[in-house]
Amino acid sequence: MTIAERIERLPLGRFHRRFIALVSLGNFFDLYDIFIVAYIGAALQQSGFLTLRQFTLFVAAGFLGMFVGTVVFGMGSDRMGRRSAFILLLLIYSVFTFADAFAPTAAWLIALRFFAGMGIGAEIVVIDTYVTEVVPGRARGRYVAITQVAGFCAVPVAAVLSRLLVPTHFLMSGWRWVMVIGASGALLTWWFRRRLPESPRWLESRGRLAEADAIMSGLETESFSKEGKRIYTDGTESAEDTEKKESGSFWELWRRPYLSRTVMLVIFQALQTIGFYGFANWAPTFLLKRGVSLLHSLEYTMLIAVVSPIGPLLAAWTSDRMERKWTIVVLALLVAGLGLGFGNSIAPAAVVGFGALLTLANYWFSAAFHAYQAEMFPTRLRATGVGFTYSWSRLSAAFTSILIGAVLVHGVPTVFAMLAVAMILVATVVGVMGPRTNGLVLEEISR
């Protein structure tokens, strides 16, 4: 019996809940750090610590770091393992974010943000890969979405903390405390790392069948203890024996059947981040440019942020019921339309209303595609494929920050027209090139 068959036959229970809780905690602090940029950014500019140009570089540095981290560590987790990568990246992120909180100058703030970004970007890739491999296919989309629910709960938390702390000064500026809290929480998550197992699918793909069997035996014993039985196996054979025994090669991404998926995901990732982070990282700055005060911009974005977990919750409910491919297409078009509404809103009620709906659609979209992208490649290539294609979103986000800074002089509506075009192209490429994945075992999708 293969590792895949043993994973698929496990009942969903205590192990899966514990595993998802620990991984979700890591995702919470990852997304907390990504989204605090929007909330502290307005304060950094108003206080004079950063100019608009320097804020643009600050945002770009974080995404460039994510690009490098995704390429080096995200793809590297195919060699070092999912658990090892998850632990290492949490440590990198927390140490450099903590140091960034005490940056004495704008140059230090920007430089340290780059190194913190290395941990943040790759961690997201590893989480998607890790969960996809450990959870049975019947719940894969739902459980990936749950990690996103936990992650996006960080958005209202970051917004509320920023609203409370940014205007204050206790020993140091309030925005520094917002960063310290995130780094401290990530270190706490790192402390709980001992309870995470390595991915049995990854161990199998590396030929470490005895270790994979030992982990699965432990999970089976725990999962079936209440029934007083465990799955009976006659030894573990490798599912990848029917594919390739050796480690996957980067160049395999450019051969059939993975070529079209690689091209589709590269285009998708390069474009989706324009629409997603164009709003998420710049909303308070857009409001400042509209003449809204710092305090009111933080209040508006705090109200908008309250709905953040609802999008991933909807994804958790629909992910295994609705085909993920078409969910992504519909939501991309919805984000485009709502973005145009937000960009042309002036009245506070319209700003908050369109902003809340846009946030809900954006984060539902995010949860759906995180489950989808990790299904595209076999275990031996999964982190390499996801890491390489996802890295384009980080590179795109870095240049998008610079582009938005330049386009913003022509007005907020112009920026959102640009974002809408990007999301329409996203819907087109997924609709035309994306495969269907719902209800299939990973090994079936990867053939």
Where do the PLM segments sit?
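Transmembrane-helix signature of 12-pass secondary carriers
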Residues: 1-447
